[in-house]
Amino acid sequence: MHSRAKGILEKFQALFSLRSEESRPRWFWVRRSLYGLLVCSLFPFTYLVLLSDETTFLRQGTFCDSTNRITTPVHLRDRLSLDSTVPFATDLSHIVFGISSSAETWDRERPYNELWWRPGEMHGYVWLDEEPPADSTWPSTSPPYRVSTFNASTIGGSSSAAQIARTVVESYKAVMAEPGSREIRWFVIGDDGTVLFPENVVAMLNKYDHEEMYYIGSISESVEQTVRHSYSIAYGGAGFVVSQSVAAELALMMDGCLERYANLYGSDERVQSCISELGVILTIEPGFHQVDLQDDIYGLLAAHPVAPLLSLNHLRHLKPISPHWETQVEAVKSLVEVSQHDPSRTLQQAICYEHRPGVNWSVSVSWGYSVEVYPQHVSSKELAKPLMTFRTWRTRSPGPFTFDVRPVDPNRACELPLIFFLDQAKSETGRNGIIRTITEYSRNMTDSVISSCKLQSYIKALELETVTVYATKMNPDDWKRVTSL
């Protein structure tokens, strides 16, 4: 390995276990007769270069070879040497979370909120439209609640949309009245069903100067939604962030602004319209996910953008993200828990190939979630596109979407991957102090479509039962280097 890249690029190792008379798993480079594979780690910035080049994968990308080396293009190594260290790093103590909800919906949605909320470690509020029922006890596992003091009925249009739009102002005014308010840098706003990944939110915010005026979020996944509403708004279910200076300015002008935009449909458009009057435009972070999708979002999670996973929304309306769990809350809890082992690497995609007599495999790892094995060659450009396992949010149409997709045709089973979902994860620290993670994935045995393929390459691959992936814990500061590419 080139010395200049050695501190940045690590190796993924994947151990493939077989269903056979001799059940003991082995590595392919120990015995050629076994169907094993060494998968190399493609760091996010390496993957960016891999996808942006029109040349072939093996010439310009980072790849595995028979000597277990990682080869890195010279132009990438030069970029990786950049020093992006920023002093006075942001941490959770600098963030206030504002959760928009209602007395009617909170009990239904709070299981998702409580997957990520940490009492005593985080600062924020759930904003309700009225006091919760008198005979109920507010759970200690939830953020503390406040009742909005804003009389939204005095403003035309939807009063609930106006109230939700004002969550950032309510949060700002509440925290400014408390000791230590000078330490607050950012306000993170979401819905009651939004699942956030706090460590990744912190890592993302450390790319930005908190003293500047920022409005950070992401757009919808469905074109029909963005055309109907806007390409320049941060969708609130995905969550969005404003810097303290933006929140302060909104506190001075929000009420009058909401009156000016009372004709707009929802809270997201109203927030964006008011922020635009400050001369601040949306900074897009693709790790925020509104999830304006229906059915099964497997494809989106298995080919995540090259960005930290920041949020997921609309989960209650979707199929469980893993077939290993009966309910969506259980499935999402599994993802949240594995993310705590290596937040920055969660859902990051690694791609590798194994070509030798009798084996022609393409492998895609979505760390902490799934492994796909294709018993054929599939280009990295195609593997980077999510499988279209979902439909649009409003009309359940097969697109268009605001990102590239690969169609899924059940009648062409031999083109589909074998999919292994996360079973368990653990971390261990070596003698040198380096932390690595071990994640194990097992195949979805109920996938009858895959079993219908009669090609010999698929029949051999169907012997695989589990995949174990080893990876060094990713440094969250590496995300700063992605922006320099």
State the predicted function of each range.
Residues 197-198, 235-254:
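Conserved nucleotide-sugar donor-binding
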Residues 196-227:
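Conserved donor-nucleotide/metal-binding helix-loop-beta segment in metal-dependent transferases, i.e.
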Residues 186, 227-241:
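A recurrent flexible, glycine/aromatic-enriched loop bordering the glycosyltransferase active site
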Residues 2-74:
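N-terminal signal-anchor transmembrane helix specifying type II single-pass membrane topology
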Residues 85, 89-92, 112-123:
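Short, acidic, metal-binding catalytic loop of nucleotide-sugar glycosyltransferases
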Residues 107, 184, 191-205:
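Acidic donor-binding/catalytic loop of UDP-sugar-dependent glycosyltransferases
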Residues 2-3, 32-50, 69-70, 263, ...:
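C-terminal catalytic/acceptor-binding lobe
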Residues 126-185, 199:
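Active-site-proximal specificity loops/subdomain of glycosyltransferases
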